Amino acid sequence: MDKIIKSIAQSGAFRAYVLDSTETVALAQEKHNTLSSSTVALGRTLIANQILAANQKGDSKITVKVIGDSSFGHIISVADTKGHVKGYIQNTGVDIKKTATGEVLVGPFMGNGHFVTIIDYGTGNPYTSTTPLITGEIGEDFAYYLTESEQTPSAIGLNVLLDENDKVKVAGGFMVQVLPGASEEEIARYEKRLQEMPAISHLLASKNHVDALLEAIYGDEPYKRLSEEPLSFQCDCSRERFEAALMTLPKADLQAMIDEDKGAEIVCQFCGTKYQFNENDLEALINDKA
């Protein structure tokens, strides 16, 4: 089962979140049938939103939109504070690797654009923030958002490793943040350790990448595990929700679906689930509108 572990240095100087998001990203790949680059881009966005949601309280919903002007198009993810996330990528078929190394490429195919977050606290006044894409690699763009929008300098690592068949092998990430009150000496030590950390892809390839991430972040510094919480890809779509959407259409449009298509099929963008509405279903909706 996927999980996020929240921890804090014994000194109180900084905190870290580490994530295993392998099943989340694998299920997203399965539902959307994404090719290599699209899988990694979508996966990184889902992991970023899992981190962002873990930072919220109450019943907030967090939407992350990575909007680029190149091959991927846009990536949309929605998460809640209970560990659930869903998402999709506009172009599922991007499959580009470096010839020499086989490394999956993401940044060059995100293009210019924006990292948008919408935090809905359930009060009717969602908070929206937009920052420019810095590299298109998503991790760096997320870190820039945290620094610029939330005024919280953060170190971020996100990645998805694929097997020889381009299926998700492992996915995860981390966030490290300096806390108020940290001394200059503690900040310098933390920055040095982060600079010396192995690449996120190397750490994810470890036998137990969650422990490898924690060890790389803290080194010999004592720390406390504050909590371990489950994560999952879960869509909250339903037939009732799409039926309500159909009810907002004019009667003429519903009648056209009956006359021309003998019904309607609605596909959820976030999970690919198909909902069928036959002629009788649509006629019932028309009668309900009368």
UniProtKB/Swiss-Prot annotation:
CDD domains: Hsp33 (cd00498). Keywords: Chaperone, Cytoplasm, Disulfide bond, Redox-active center, Zinc. Pfam families: HSP33. Under oxidizing conditions two disulfide bonds are formed involving the reactive cysteines. Under reducing conditions zinc is bound to the reactive cysteines and the protein is inactive. Disulfide bonds join 235-237, 268-271. It is found in: Cytoplasm. Signal peptide: none annotated. GO terms for molecular function: protein folding chaperone; unfolded protein binding. GO terms for cellular component: cytoplasm. GO terms for biological process: protein refolding. PANTHER family: 33 KDA CHAPERONIN (PTHR30111:SF1). Belongs to the HSP33 family. Redox regulated molecular chaperone. Protects both thermally unfolding and oxidatively damaged proteins from irreversible aggregation. Plays an important role in the bacterial defense system toward oxidative stress. This is 33 kDa chaperonin. The lineage of its organism: Bacteria, Bacillati, Bacillota, Bacilli, Lactobacillales. The gene is hslO.
